[in-house]
Amino acid sequence: MANIVSNEKTYRHTQKVRKENHAKMSKLRTIVKKTRSSNEQAQLNEAYKVIDTTASKGVIHKNKANRLKSRTAKAFKTNLEVTA
């Protein structure tokens, strides 16, 4: 643990941000998994929203967000064709 007050504050802040980012990533992974096996357009729109929000907050890189949206849409489309 840090001996300097400012370092202690930085440590507390880092831990808080880490927990928040972990929660955002968990939500992202969950919604992507549900969307890939879903056949509802609203679910895909919600996934896009969560992916964009996560990228804008800096949790994931914007290129990763675009790649994730593309792959999710492809899996969604494949699942839609199989169930139809």
Swiss-Prot record:
Protein name, entry field: Small ribosomal subunit protein bS20
Entry keyword set: Ribonucleoprotein, Ribosomal protein, RNA-binding, rRNA-binding
Region (Disordered): 1-25
Physiological role: Binds directly to 16S ribosomal RNA.
Gene this protein is translated from: rpsT
One GO term of the biological process aspect: translation
Organism, as annotated: Ureaplasma parvum serovar 3 (strain ATCC 700970)
Gene3D superfamilies: Ribosomal protein S20
Source superkingdom: Bacteria
Family (UniProt): Belongs to the bacterial ribosomal protein bS20 family.
Any one GO cellular component localisation term in the record: cytosol
GO molecular function, one term: structural constituent of ribosome
